[in-house]
Regions:
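Non-catalytic cap/lid and distal C-terminal segments of serine-dependent acyl enzymes
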Residues: 22-306
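C-terminal motif of bacterial Sec signal peptides marking the signal peptidase cleavage site
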Residues: 17-18
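Bacterial N-terminal signal peptides that target proteins for export
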Residues: 1-8
Length: 306
């Protein structure tokens, strides 16, 4: 299975529980006077260090506030928590602004990017923190996977309280958005603590992990629960099936897995569940995310009309 690659690097902030405001790019004259170009920074974003006291790891969270945040001091906003923040945070931030240029399409929200643990590579951090069991791909050591439950506890006890104590967040309207292993993490939270978030975006979710572990967890949940109070949106690229193209997946039928999960969830008759999915044509595991992000935000946070 091809890994979900990183595409962008953000500036890091030093210090525990510290904040750095992003600055606008330097003026051309100042840049020209330097031997090297200045790093590109996203204006109006913040980086906070939120450590995990249990594991001792340090994580950064990236924050982008909506345009009306300062002018609407009484308003509380939904919060979108996105995994793989180094890649996804700048993309989602721009989508939210671009789509609304000619009128409201997506409701304004606070965007929170969940970055990787400091000192670890993105691959190592996500393999460890986003997976539910140690039983990863056969080529991987067991120690590299399986700490998703511990990371979920970190989100619940550290990251979310940090955000909600500092920003005007609506705790009843949290959204968790993840792609690939991030979608796998979302499914883990959905079936173990569904009310932690109101909406779940499971993008190209790795339901193949550990021989279909998530499918078994879904069945276990159904045996002991009569409701699943959540709004679930899944997206998948049409190429995410085995096939002759280099864009196809190596062996997992991820499209079939998403369809099977949607069918299973709908068959349960949970009164509090809304679930839907979309297969995006001419997209593969590495290209589908920007389109999937857009469709997902339009689905789970549609702008209020009138």
């Amino acid at each position: 299975m091809r890994a979900f690659g990183l595409a962008m690097v953000l500036l890091a902030a030093a210090g525990t529980w510290s904040c750095t405001e992003r600055a606008d790019a330097q003026a051309p004259a100042a840049v020209a006077a330097k031997a090297e170009g200045a790093p590109y920074a996203l204006a109006g974003t913040q980086v906070w260090t939120v450590p995990d006291p249990v594991s001792g790891r340090e994580y950064e969270v990236f924050v982008s506030l909506p345009a009306s945040y300062e002018t609407s001091p009484e308003r509380r906003y939904p919060v979108v928590y996105v995994t793989d923040a180094d890649y996804a945070f700048p993309i989602i931030r721009q989508i939210a602004r671009r789509v609304n240029l000619e009128g409201p399409v997506i409701e304004e929200f606070i965007l929170v990017g969940l970055s990787y643990s400091r000192g670890d590579s993105g691959v190592a951090s996500r393999n460890r923190d986003y997976t539910p069991t140690p039983n990863g791909p056969s080529s991987a050591k067991a120690s590299l996977h399986g700490q998703g439950p511990a990371y979920q506890t970190y989100l619940k006890n550290q990251a979310i309280p940090f955000i909600e104590s500092r920003f005007r967040a609506d705790p009843a309207r949290r959204v968790l958005l993840g792609h690939s292993y991030g979608g796998l993490l979302g499914a883990q939270v959905l079936f173990s603590d569904p009310t932690l978030f109101h909406s779940y975006v499971l993008g190209s979710p790795s339901f193949w992990f550990d021989k279909g572990h998530t499918m078994r967890v879904e069945a276990d949940y159904a045996r002991s629960h009569r409701d699943l109070p959540a709004d679930v949106f899944m997206y998948i690229g049409a190429y995410e099936v085995p096939g002759p193209s280099p864009r196809n997946t190596d062996d997992a039928d991820m499209v079939g897995d998403v369809r099977a999960m949607e069918q299973k969830l709908k068959s349960r008759g949970y009164p509090g569940l809304q679930v839907r999915s979309t297969v995006l044509e001419d997209e593969d595991h590495l290209t589908v995310a920007p389109v999937g992000f857009t469709r997902a935000l339009m689905a789970v946070l549609p702008a209020k009309r009138g």
